[in-house]
Amino acid sequence: MDTKDFKRLEKMYSPRYLPGLDGLRAFAVIGIIIYHLNAQWLSGGFLGVDTFFVISGYLITSLLISEYYRTQKIDLLEFWKRRLKRLIPAVLFLICVVLTFTLIFKPELIIQMKRDAIAAIFYVSNWWYISQNVDYFNQFAIEPLKHLWSLAIEEQFYLLFPLVITFLLHRFKPRNIIQTLFIVSLISLGLMIVIHFITGDNSRVYFGTDTRLQTLLLGCILAFIWPPFALKKDISKKIVVSLDIIGISGFAVLMTLFFIVGDQDQWIYNGGFYIISFATLFIIAIAVHPSSLFAKFLSMKPLLIIGKRSYSLYLWHYPIIVFVNSYYVQGQIPVYVYIIEILLTALMAEISYRFIETPIRKKGFKAFAFLPKKKSQFARTVLVILLLIPSIIVLSGQFDALGKQHEAEKKEKKTEFKTTKKKVVKKDKQEDKQTANSKEDIKKSSPLLIGDSVMVDIGNVFTKKIPNAQIDGKVGRQLVDATPIVKSQYKDYAKKGQKVVVELGTNGAFTKDQLNELLDSFGKADIYLVSIRVPRDYEGRINKLIYEAAEKRSNVHLVDWYKASAGHPEYFAYDGIHLEYAGSKALTDLIVKTMETHATNKK
């Protein structure tokens, strides 16, 4: 290849800045931040991560094929070096700050934080959280580095994909490469569906590189079909209008999904992520076109400012929200706290972007130096050292003693409360009537209480109030899990005159049919159905089903915990679901009072 040919290829395949993608990044990161602030505000905001994945797949592949077409090779070492300078410094800065903050303000969490930090440093956070059975959608646990799972997937992709694409470009035509990538994306989709069907674990398929590769590969495929360097600026107005209609329509669909999709919706784990990501391809395709008015909309200055800092904003928003929220009861956080979290996120993101990421991206590690003439370099170096020293000591395990008691308490924490099964005594009709009409006999009765971790919380308090109660509470239990248990173990309670308390729904949504099946399994027993208080997007839907069941069924009585607990943050632990002693006592008293009221009304 002579110099003339090289210059022609250089001009033809030269990569260009794509401001429209920064604008799309802005919407994605805003959605993610709102979701983590309060999932009830934007239940599908977590889909912003998938938008990032598709963009990453598209951009990285575009850069790689552009380089290959220009030079007939891909400099892998240079590619990895650029990724290193772009991603790692900001993550290390974040981890050092989080470890230092934990050491000073949350020392009891130091062991957990050390383990999470090590996983984050080596970009294996997603597999680490899978191995620890971490629930991604449990926003109430103090896990400030949990959001780094997505960066782990991207870094794993950046490490391996260039090797694969280099091999494919040398041996196959673009059409064959597209077919190969499409098949692999379908395999990834199939793995998500199969693993989810077998395990029923949303977090396993959400965290897994194997099950999330589908989204990245769709972006890669688009880069071959619609490379940015091949798009012409001079096109007819009709084509421009058509492109904008496609872009705006796709964008409207994505934004709608941000509002209506929930993290417990099962369809998204059974092909939904693939469909949503496929729809995102149309937005990206128009966002990168040089003639699109929609691309110009995405290129507005405010969106570009946010989009260029989207990586920094993503890094910092989650630990700030987690740490600040840990001092409040979830679901009862004052509005000013959210404002503080947003401001802190913007501040730390700007510090990271301006003083860590940009200097290193431009100058490499020369941005750090002990040169008196360059105060910014000196200050930056001192700051990093001040954060690095305690972080290294934490990672070495020197402060583990501070967290050993907390780790022991976690292991000893009750995950189940179950009283010894009591024999259900059959009563004649006259005895049933007397029992129902006597408040005193409520405390001598033998009701069945079945529930989740909230039931575990009230177990000891309730048995002091009603010693003969049969209690079956288990952490993580969902309503659908309870129905087969009732049918196999508690058939004796499905009789008129028996009393049953049902407290379920904090761990996930259920349908009207599922609730009816559970209630039907108790026959004509008096059922006391407890409404839920859980700061999740499904709270209102579940309570509506509970209220409707209590209204329509003569044997179902409402225990309105949602109403009774309003304005009582002292009832709850940090997560806004589990109960402190005051809450356990209040819920116990409410259940007993509801039983007594029902007994009185039957006179």
Swiss-Prot record:
Main location: membrane
GO molecular-function terms, A-Z: acyltransferase activity, transferring groups other than amino-acyl groups
Signal peptide: none
Domain of life: Bacteria
UniProt keyword annotation of Protease present: no
A GO cellular component annotation in the UniProt record: plasma membrane
Membrane-protein topology: Multi-pass membrane protein
Active site: 453, 575, 578
Main enzyme class: transferase
Transmembrane annotation, as ranges: 17-37, 45-65, 87-107, 148-168, 177-197, 211-231, 239-259, 268-288, 311-331, 333-353, 382-402
InterPro entries linked: Acyl_transf_3_dom (IPR002656), Acyltransferase_3 (IPR050879), SGNH_hydro_sf (IPR036514)
Summary of the function given for this chain in its UniProt record: Responsible for O-acetylation at the C(6)-hydroxyl group of N-acetylmuramyl residues, forming the corresponding N,6-O-diacetylmuramic acid of the peptidoglycan. O-acetylation of the peptidoglycan is the major determinant for lysozyme resistance.
UniProt-recorded name of the protein: O-acetyltransferase OatA
Gene: oatA
